[in-house]
């Protein structure tokens, strides 16, 4: 108790001790708020693969025509549609290639289909497509369909002998790409997005797709008879099953 009283009786000493303590606290506070300066580091850019590197990672597949199948499903329409037939038009001698890259966006697809090689209303193909394609038309009806289809009023096969399908952009996973394709058909080009399913099995590549096109988009007026009582529907369903074999030689 006496020591405390003695200390209180010496204000100069107390003032100096309080001032020193306050200064020390301020220094500590300043030291806590200012962190040591860290050397700055610039963000590192991700390496961009060169075209040569992409080419080395690209695998080329040649379309195998004997194993591939492209079908155009053509439907009847109009008030008396039941008097007509639905048709299965199969492409033959399909040509082209697929280049598959580790970077899907660098992949590509090209298909060429000779129009004159179309096979119309094959019995097996119609059976595959189900009840909508029963019954099987007779040979005379099939021949008439072929004449109309290849003629100037529809496909005009003499003037436009091939259909070309080329990829413009590919997006999505390797097993299910959305492929933007440019279709050149009947002298007209149109772009559509085609969802695909892709399966790799050893040295083979299988690409399947189902999509629709409108004849009128390609400058074709769908056929009709009896003042439109029996018509060919404008929309054509396209079913593709493309099988391609790996080509061992590196792409040029």
Task: Mark where each language-model region is.
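N-terminal secretory signal peptides that target proteins for export/translocation
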Residues: 1-15
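N-terminal hydrophobic alpha-helix used for membrane targeting or insertion
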Residues: 4-5, 22, 223
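N-terminal processing/targeting junctions
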Residues: 11-13, 23, 248
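Detector for intrinsically disordered, low-structure N-terminal pre-sequences
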Residues: 13, 17-19, 47
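Bacterial N-terminal signal peptides
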Residues: 19-30
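Low-complexity, acidic/polar, glycine-enriched regions of mature
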Residues: 32-252
